[in-house]
Regions:
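Basic, polyanion-binding surface patches
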Residues: 1-181
Length: 181
């Protein structure tokens, strides 16, 4: 079960650099894609880089909204799969066993199996980043996290709270449960 997180703590869901699953709802179709480049730039503002050639890029550009879903380590297969096929060609929710659930503030769905969610609306006027990607700045409209996994920050001693981190190619790491002394 998810609990609502105050927006002033929304940045703490992705401040440590986890891989995210970005969901959209565009022209009557839901979609999900893997995003490694998402970061907070303020308590309730995020920056997300999406390849300009992706179906998800068009969906975000046209609808102005998305959800950043934070997967736990148990979703590595879905993370890899959603990053390897186009949502234009298939229903990735069905193909990779993900459950769409209604978001509170945007039309894009949340992913039930994910441990955290940031519902976002694009701030108009984003600029090109290099030639192949676009940077979207978005305001977080709602934030939620799985009960028991987050206090003032992620409870990394809890194995289910350990997030995935992209190391390059198909290599991923998992957030450790050890805290520095």
């Amino acid at each position: 079960m998810k609990k609502t997180l105050p927006l002033e703590h929304a940045y703490r869901l992705i401040n440590h650099g986890p891989v995210t699953l970005l969901t959209t709802h565009y022209r009557g179709r839901r979609n999900v894609c893997t995003i490694a480049w998402a970061m907070p730039v303020d308590a309730a503002v995020v920056a997300v880089v999406v390849s300009a050639g992706n179906y998800s890029f068009r969906a975000v550009r046209e609808t102005g909204e998305f959800v950043l879903n934070i997967p736990g380590r148990g979703l590595l297969g879905a993370v890899l799969g959603c990053g390897s096929v186009s949502g234009e060609a298939c229903d990735k929710f069905r193909r990779f066993g993900l459950t769409p659930i209604k978001a509170r503030k945007v039309k894009a769905p949340r992913i039930a199996e994910c441990i955290g969610h940031l519902e976002c609306r694009v701030i108009p006027g984003h600029g090109k980043l290099a030639r192949e990607h676009d940077l979207f700045l978005a305001r977080v409209e709602a934030a939620a996290v799985e009960r028991g996994l987050f206090g003032a920050q992620w409870k990394i001693d809890e194995p289910r709270a350990r997030t995935l981190h992209h190391l390059g190619g198909t290599a991923f790491g998992v957030l450790s449960g050890r805290r520095p002394r």
